[in-house]
C-alpha cells in the first residue's frame, strides 16, 4: 500500500493506493465530517482500519460510501462498522434488497468464489444526486458495464473523478454481466463516453495510481473493449484468469490440487467453461488458464504448488 502522491490533489483528500486484491480507498475530510469511499477486500480489513485510523488521528469516521459491491470494494465494510458504531453506510441502490437479505448469489460472492462479511447500510447513493464531502461537491453518475449497479463520483470544481473500475490507466474491470451471458459491452462504451464528457483533469481509479492523462487511458480502454466485443471468447478467458489470479492473490500459495478443488466449484468458472471450453473437460480447461497465467508471469508452479507472482 502507498499513498498516491504523484498527482496533486485538493486538501482534505487522501488516496490509499492498495493494489489488485483490495480496491483503492479515498478518504475525504472537512470540518463537517470524514467520508471513506470503498473499503477493500476482507483479507486486508485490519490494514484498511489501521490506515483510516492513522489518517483520522482520533476523529471518527462518519460516512462510508461504496461505488459498487464487488468484494474488493466493500470487504472492509463490516470491520469499519464494528469499529465505528455510529458510522453511516451508503450503497448504490441496485443491490439494496440483496444486502438487506444478504444474498451472496445476487451479490456475486458465491458466483466468483470470493468472500465478503455481511454488512448493513443506512442510505442509498442515488445517481443524479450531489453530496458535499471534503469541502467538495460530488456528483453521483450511474456507470454500468463492469457492474450494472456501479456509480462513479465527479467533483466538477476540481475536475476530479473517482472512476471505480469503469476506467483505469491501463483499461477497465472485467465486464461481469458478460460472464453470465448478458450483453454489456455497449454499456461499457457508454460509460467511457460519459467519462469523456465529464472531462476530468485528475482520475482516481479503483485500482492503480492516480493519473491525469485522460485521452490515452480512454483510447486504450476503447481499444481493449473493441477487441473483447469482436471476440467474446477473449474476454471470457480474460475473466477466467482474473478470477483465478484474484484467488491466488488472496491465498499467496496453495497446492495445485486444492486450488483445482476450489476452482471446479466456482459457478462463474463453470459457466465460462460450458460456453467457451471448446469441448475440453473442466480440469483441462482450467489447466490451460493456469498455464497462460504462468506464461505471463502471474503465477509460479513448482512441485505441485502454486505461488502468486
Model-derived features with residue positions:
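Conserved beta-strand hairpin/beta-sheet module of binuclear metal-dependent hydrolase folds
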Residues: 2-56, 152-164, 169
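A structural signal for the main folded, soluble domain(s) of proteins
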Residues: 46, 75, 80-82, 207-211, ...
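Short Pro/Gly-enriched beta-strand edge/turn motifs at strand-loop
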Residues: 7-13, 109-113, 134-136
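Divalent metal-coordination and catalytic microenvironments
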Residues: 28, 38, 68, 80, ...
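Metallo-beta-lactamase
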Residues: 34, 41-43, 137-230
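Active-site HxH/HxHxD metal-binding segment of metal-dependent hydrolases
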Residues: 43-46, 50-133
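Aromatic/hydrophobic pocket-lining residues that form the small-molecule binding cavity
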Residues: 74, 188-189, 286
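C-terminal regulatory/interaction regions
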Residues: 236-309
Amino acid at each position: 500500500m502507498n499513498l498516491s502522491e504523484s498527482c496533486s490533489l485538493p486538501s482534505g483528500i487522501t488516496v490509499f493506493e492498495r493494489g489488485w486484491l483490495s480496491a483503492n480507498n479515498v478518504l475525504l475530510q472537512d470540518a463537517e465530517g470524514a467520508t471513506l469511499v470503498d473499503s477493500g477486500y476482507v483479507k486486508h480489513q485490519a490494514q484498511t482500519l489501521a490506515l483510516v485510523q492513522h489518517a483520522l488521528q482520533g476523529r471518527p469516521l462518519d460516512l462510508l460510501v461504496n461505488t459498487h459491491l464487488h468484494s474488493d470494494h466493500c470487504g472492509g465494510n463490516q470491520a469499519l462498522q464494528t469499529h465505528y458504531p455510529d458510522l453511516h453506510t451508503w450503497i448504490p441502490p441496485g443491490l439494496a434488497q440483496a444486502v438487506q437479505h444478504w444474498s451472496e448469489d445476487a451479490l456475486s460472492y458465491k458466483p466468483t468464489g470470493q468472500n465478503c462479511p455481511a454488512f448493513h447500510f443506512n442510505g442509498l447513493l442515488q445517481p443524479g444526486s450531489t453530496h458535499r464531502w471534503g469541502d467538495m461537491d460530488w456528483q453521483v453518475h450511474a456507470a454500468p458495464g463492469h457492474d450494472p449497479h456501479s456509480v462513479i463520483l465527479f467533483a466538477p470544481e476540481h475536475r476530479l473523478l473517482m472512476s471505480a473500475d469503469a476506467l483505469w490507466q491501463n483499461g477497465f474491470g472485467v465486464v461481469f454481466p458478460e460472464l453470465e451471458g448478458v450483453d454489456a459491452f455497449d454499456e461499457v462504451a457508454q460509460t467511457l463516453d460519459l467519462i469523456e464528457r465529464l472531462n476530468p483533469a485528475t482520475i482516481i481509479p479503483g485500482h492503480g495510481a492516480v493519473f491525469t492523462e485522460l485521452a490515452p487511458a480512454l483510447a486504450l480502454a476503447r481499444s481493449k473493449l473493441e477487441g473483447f466485443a469482436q471476440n467474446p471468447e477473449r474476454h471470457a478467458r480474460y475473466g477466467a484468469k482474473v478470477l483465478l489470479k484474484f484467488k491466488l492473490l488472496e491465498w499467496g500459495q496453495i497446492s495445485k490440487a486444492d486450488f483445482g478443488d476450489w476452482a471446479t466449484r466456482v459457478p462463474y468458472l463453470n459457466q465460462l467453461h460450458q460456453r467457451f471450453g471448446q469441448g475440453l473437460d473442466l480440469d483441462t480447461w482450467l489447466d490451460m488458464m493456469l498455464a497462460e497465467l504462468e506464461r505471463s508471469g502471474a503465477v509460479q508452479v513448482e512441485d505441485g504448488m502454486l505461488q502468486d507472482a
